Amino acid sequence: MGRTVRQKRKNRSSRPKVKQTNRPKKALNPLGNDLIAKNWNKKETLTQNYRRLGLLTRLQAPTGGVEPGLRGAADDKSNAHAPLGLSERKSTASSAVREVRVKRDAEGRIVSVINEEASAAANPLDDPLNELETDSDWEGFGSDDEAPTGDRVVDQLERMARVPRVKTVRGLSEREVEWLESLVAKHGDNVKAMERDHRLNPMQQTAADISRRLRRLRGE
């Protein structure tokens, strides 16, 4: 049945709806240190940025899972030793029997081997890895090039921490000087009386605190 005339309409709630912000998706903006802010990558998480800069996100032991690396460094390090199986193929190809052109002297002894691969450069598939002569030339896909950046940032942070800082002495404000002078004009050097004066000491400052402020006023 439909709504009748006597049915009461539901009153709208006057309380606004609470909107939950998605904090993990909020971009981090480090403002504490200029050096870290300069080397910060907004496309990476906090853990990834700190790991790249050589810093720790927490001083305690990890309690949960470990965040994956930037580009799968664990798998790439294993591939760095045998990338795409090139080392196995290269060793197999080097051990295979093949024909070469040699240069002999008048007595028939081999003087030198004519290298035709350098001139021919057989690369029918245009493989960019064909130019790598040895396995030592391969640097892998890992993030080893990021280590110098982290070391450089850590060294600069350590140098900044070793710079001696001048200790700034807190001064007294004009209103604070007027308040202390009014206490001294009424009670002299009696700090206990200043502490019990509810009219001039409405914030109930202790005797030790008033004495410390008076020494700062006198430059002691």
From Swiss-Prot:
The gene is NOP16. It comes from Pyricularia oryzae (strain 70-15 / ATCC MYA-4617 / FGSC 8958) (Rice blast fungus). One of its GO terms (cellular component) is nucleolus. It holds the Pfam family Nop16. Involved in the biogenesis of the 60S ribosomal subunit. Coiled coil: none annotated. Its main location: nucleus. GO terms for biological process: ribosomal large subunit biogenesis; rRNA processing. Residues 1-33, 62-82, 199-220 are annotated as: Disordered. It comes from the Eukaryota. This is Nucleolar protein 16. It is found in: Nucleus, Nucleolus.
